[in-house]
Amino acid sequence: MFRLLKNGDVYAPEHIGKSDILICNDKIVDIAEHIDFDYPGTEVVDLEGRKVIPGVIDQHIHVTGGGGESGFTSKVTEVGLSDLVRGGVCTVVGVLGTDSISRNVESLLAKVKALNEEGLTAYCYTGSYDYPSPTVTGSVGRDIALIDEVIGVKICISDHRYAGITRKELTKLAAAARVAGLVGKKPGVVHIHMGAGKKGLKDVFKIIEKTDIPVKTFRPTHAKNNLK
């Protein structure tokens, strides 16, 4: 199936201006100032006055819903495919948050699989704020290495909701994620929820200083919570 997008203001990602885009099935085959293409059955869409950008990659979405810190009625419902597409998101990484009591990694993985079936590109992290990390297989390393959609582990530090993980335990968690990533040919990252606590990223910096674990293993998020 061919689709020809005409007259869009295109960013690829640099701004190239008014252009046409020819798509065959799920592949972009040409971008040019003007494309003449009249293959029978081609769908032509006029994008005059609209911007065209690459799909957004969002590495932190609570696809099964966030919230839940003000009782069960505060739980946010899970995200739908249309919510993501309307926001221009084409790739997501699903995460658990504070609540790993009424939510779990299994339901997160199932939601990610569903999004993939619907045509999105979706991954997830095993683990949550809790420690020891909740997993599917009983092991962070096995989850990352053996489950296609799992590319790392989520943890929380320096936050009143964190599970008391020590620097030594965080080092072991990062080492497990690193090795599993190598085995499974995955990023093998530790996705860290950063709170506004006193220690900030000190433990992470110490691990980087004192061990051989690569800095790219650590992916802090919500860093604005602690700018000291």
Where are these regions (language model features)?
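Active-site core of metal-dependent hydrolases
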Residues: R161, E169, A175-K228
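Divalent metal-coordination and catalytic microenvironments
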Residues: G8, I21, D26, G49, ...
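Active-site gating/metal-coordination segments in enzymes
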Residues: P132-V189
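Active-site mouth loops of central-metabolism enzymes
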Residues: H62-K75, T126-P132, H160-G164
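Metal-associated gating/positioning segment near the N- to mid-region
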Residues: F37, L47-A110
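Active-site environment of divalent metal-dependent phosphoester hydrolases
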Residues: T64, T98-R103, D130-P132, A196-K202, ...
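Hydrophobic faces of well-ordered beta-strands that scaffold small-molecule active sites
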Residues: G55-Q59, V92-G94, A122-T126, I151-I157, ...
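Histidine-rich, glycine-flanked metal-binding segment
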Residues: M1-L4, V10-I53
